[in-house]
């Protein structure tokens, strides 16, 4: 509800800039042409992930992960980190924050292990692992359009090195700080109650099978080069038909992320007006120019600072005109994707993650979160930009 109110305020403010002529209608038309397919994809993928979760796919994986951990905390943690990374890369960071967080917390509780290292792993990877593919993050989709609509394979070729670095640094930090907790063992046959995961979601094997097939077909389609909203919409429609037959009560209008849509549309309008008035020119004085290591690091740090002060989406939109080539665009994405680890509002995924934790009676203090983030975020950005400078276009091994 809070997000919807903010979105409504932004939408009204954006509407005022249009009606008063501050933002010309022609610019609005260009903006709509750019973001409509992206928002269509976001809606479709939200429906897909919600229905897949209702079918019990994530819960099925969670039940097996505890067994695959072989009673060793470190192995279970690595498996859950892989789970969160793959979920972020292929289903987006918000999916990890909203749907995988309860699963990860429940698995840790069932194993009788401390929740904090697992919860932090989830939210950090939801952000830092969102660099590899366009579908991983809304900022990536916008960047893909800005880069001339390059294919997912070309995008991954640009981002693979910083993406690997951005995943490894937070994991290394957690492995060091929580080394005692991760040395523990657990009983593989634990009978602890599965708090936070609905048992009704696993009762329909037909829906579980349909969801698995849809996901197996959807993931390669999303990286095939076809406009991503098309396979996402087809997957949402297929699952919608299956649920209409098997569990029609699940199909409700709340499957569509109305608050997120309202917030995003309003934000796009306001930021577009700011760009039209020259906000990006002022930001350019801070972000600098050039594509050497220090220049790329400066741009990435600017994106991270803007993300933690305001939010990563407006930080990206305002700095986008400053990313004039693939190297600088990659550096900006490192900043706005891997940098929002300090303040609660830096990324929507972090707020969604914390909301899920509160619902499950897991206490994570923002002060401690920020202190950890002040260490992890700069180290992650430094490592990711270094990887970009070495392996990216024009780099030593690029």
Where in the sequence are the language-model features?
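Interfacial loop-to-helix junctions that mark the boundaries of transmembrane helices
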Residues: 1-4, 25-38, 152-162, 202-204, ...
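Hydrophobic mid-bilayer segments of alpha-helices in multi-pass membrane transport proteins
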Residues: 1-23, 34-47, 99, 207-217, ...
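Membrane-embedded alpha-helical segments and adjacent helix-loop junctions characteristic
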Residues: 25, 29-114, 258-260, 264-326
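Alpha-helical transmembrane segments
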Residues: 34-46, 154-172, 327-343
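Membrane-interface alpha-helices at helix entry/exit sites of multi-pass transporters
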Residues: 71-79, 110-122, 150-161, 326-337, ...
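Alpha-helical transmembrane segments and, especially, the helix-loop junctions at the ends
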Residues: 88-98, 115-149, 170-171, 307-317, ...
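Juxtamembrane and boundary regions of transmembrane helices in multi-pass small-molecule transporters
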Residues: 153-199, 345-398
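Long, contiguous bundles of hydrophobic transmembrane helices that form the permeation core
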Residues: 167-247
């Amino acid at each position: 509800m809070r997000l919807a109110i903010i979105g409504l305020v932004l939408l009204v403010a954006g509407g005022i800039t249009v009606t008063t002529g501050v933002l010309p209608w022609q610019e609005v038309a260009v903006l709509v042409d750019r973001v409509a397919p992206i928002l269509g994809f976001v809606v479709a993928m939200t429906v897909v992930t919600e229905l897949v979760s209702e079918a019990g796919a994530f819960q099925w994986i969670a039940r097996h992960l505890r067994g695959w951990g072989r009673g060793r905390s470190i192995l279970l943690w690595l498996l859950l980190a892989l789970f969160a990374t793959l979920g972020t890369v292929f289903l987006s960071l918000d999916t990890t924050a909203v749907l995988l967080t309860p699963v990860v917390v429940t698995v840790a509780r069932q194993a009788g292990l401390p929740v904090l290292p697992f919860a932090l792993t989830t939210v950090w990877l939801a952000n830092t692992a969102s660099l590899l593919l366009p579908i991983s993050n809304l900022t990536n989709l916008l960047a893909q359009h800005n880069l001339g609509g390059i294919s997912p394979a070309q995008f991954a070729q640009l981002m693979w090195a910083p993406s690997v670095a951005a995943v490894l640094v937070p994991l290394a930090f957690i492995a060091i700080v929580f080394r005692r907790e991760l040395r523990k063992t657990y009983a593989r046959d634990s009978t602890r109650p599965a708090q936070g995961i609905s048992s009704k979601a696993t009762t329909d094997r037909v829906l579980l099978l349909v969801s698995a097939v849809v996901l197996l077909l959807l993931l390669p389609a999303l990286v095939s080069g076809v406009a991503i909203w098309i396979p996402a919409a087809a997957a949402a429609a297929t699952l919608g038909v299956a649920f209409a037959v098997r569990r029609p009560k699940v199909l409700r209008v709340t499957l569509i992320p109305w608050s997120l849509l309202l917030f995003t549309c309003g934000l796009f309008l306001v930021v577009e007006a700011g760009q039209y008035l020259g906000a990006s020119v002022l930001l350019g004085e801070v972000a600098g120019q050039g594509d050497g290591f220090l220049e790329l690091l400066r741009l990435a740090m600017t994106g991270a600072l803007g993300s933690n002060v305001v939010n990563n989406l407006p930080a990206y939109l305002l700095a986008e005109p400053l990313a004039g080539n693939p190297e600088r665009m990659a550096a900006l994405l490192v900043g706005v994707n891997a940098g929002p680890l300090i303040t609660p509002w830096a990324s929507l995924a972090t707020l969604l993650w914390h909301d899920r934790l509160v619902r499950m009676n897991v206490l994570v203090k923002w002060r401690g979160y920020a202190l950890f983030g002040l260490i992890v975020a700069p180290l992650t950005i430094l490592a990711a930009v270094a990887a970009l400078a070495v392996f990216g276009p024009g780099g030593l091994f690029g």
